[in-house]
Amino acid sequence: MSNTVKIEIIFLACLLNLFQATASKESIPPTTPRLEKIKWDNSLTLPDLDDRPNIGVAGAFSGFIGDNLIIAGGANFPNATPWNGGNKTYWNTIYCINITQPTSKWLVLPQSMPKALAYGNSIELPTGILCIGGCDSTQCYNDVFQIQLIDGQINIDTNWPALPVPLANATASLLGDKIYLAGGQKSMEKPEATKHFFVLDLNNRNKGWKELPSWPGEPRGYAVSTSQSDGFDKCFYLFSGRNYKIDGYIKALTDGYVFNPRLNSWKKLEQSFPVMAGNALPTGANHILFLGGVPQLIPGSDDHPGFDNTI
């Protein structure tokens, strides 16, 4: 057989393989991407407390222990709004509901938190909900404890390393086996935003919290954070918040930053994120979902338009 004939046979074979591959692809019906859906349900309104309708709480510790949703502590104005002279009340109450049972109702548990607290951070762990920092009307705390649910009974595990400084209104997220915490304030008497950035290695918790280089931006409290991939590495993302000082200075922030633990470095994000005091959730491979937040500071009044419900 001549070389020319061999080449023609090989060429025809390649064309046949290409045709078969193309035909196979065209014969497979296109698949519809799996989309995540959000369904809102307002049936989980908190139960009456002390024979009064529950107006809800802000800044509570919350999370799931198995199928049980836990809400603990928090603060509210039970008697009057703040612009009408109402005083803020801090709570140590713990609520629990099993979300898998259609007839399940909220329980106000007989056990309570070690003290009335709000505006700390909650991290869901396999063993329970880790509660970090927080404040009451007079001071901020560096307490760290875990709410556990054992045989239907609440157990408070205080065998956790305290924060290096008291902090409230910080933001924290779990990234792998490490908890990252950023910002917040150290005092209620003289509230001022900080640039603290701490990490706790859950595999070496006896070493306590370690301070890391902070982001290249302004101090902040009421910020939003989450962990998500940047396309290469799992990273800690920090968004928005507000900068405030003892002299009354206050500024709403819309910037964002990403911390890469592998590189031990920060990078400023180009976009604007007006999500102060909102929530952020990782979704998909490398997306982040923002829930609510405050795009600008508006004085409290009966005519307040309410907070942002944008997602």
Regions found by a protein language model. Name each.
Residues 25-311:
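Kelch-like beta-propeller repeat domains
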